[in-house]
Amino acid sequence: FENPVVFNVTGIIWQKWSPDLPASLEPGFVLPEKIETADTYTEELIYEETLDGGEKLYGWYFEAHIRQSMDYTEFPFDHKKIELRLLPKQWQSNAVLIPDFDSYLKKDLLADSFGIDERIILDGYDLADTYFDYLRQSYDTNFGFPNYVGAEEFPELIFNIHLQRSVENAFIIYLFPIIIVLLLLFGTMLTVTSDAQKRERMDFNISMIIASCSALFFILVLAHVELRDRFITSPIVYIEYFYLLSYGAIFYVAANSYIFCEARSGMIGKLLAFEDNLLAKTAFWPS
């Protein structure tokens, strides 16, 4: 993946060309969602053979950057459906591409993934499935062609690749630091005490608590900004709720420590004084 909405794909596309096809048609294909520049798209005819019965076989090697909308709201438990749309070279000719299933060697194409190198590096994803289907595409124009019938519910061939994200990487990069921060917060909260000997032994003071909370908040904000930059075009993703909860936990520890030290009277002061701030410490994890 180049970024959250652009992925790189390379491969070979072939066509078997029957001699019975109209002479007005030419072999070739179009990837309508490709980003076509000198650096992002390559297409080269690498073989051309004549098969039995006069049928022609053409094969192209291609490299392309494809732009496609992706849903990241369930990150890191999300999955991706990459759709490689394929059109005939004369897309206005009302021709429909048909998958060449006979050229795949796997016996059960419904159960097995096909059409993709098993050694491919998927950058944090696992291959779940591949299959062909048709997209019923509609347009509000005939593009100037009087006999064009592809404007309404016209089938376009799509090669689909389903990817499942590897949760382990996301856990180590994003969730594990949050867990460490929460443990440090809880450890900081355990130092809140009214016992003079414990306060002296643990060097407890409200300034230390506020400084610790500020440092942990800064660490989380940096990680959160890096995550948001990664999914800048996406609405809030699932893992971001853990950051929001962590911000709340930081405020909770700082506010509790200040109130415990300064508000020794009243209902809140009495609740916090019970068993040396036991209620607030117990409520930390549910928060």
Q: What is the predicted function of each stretch?
A:
Residues 1-160:
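Soluble non-transmembrane domains of integral membrane proteins
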Residues 157-286:
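Channel- or pocket-lining gating/hinge segments that regulate access to a cavity or pore
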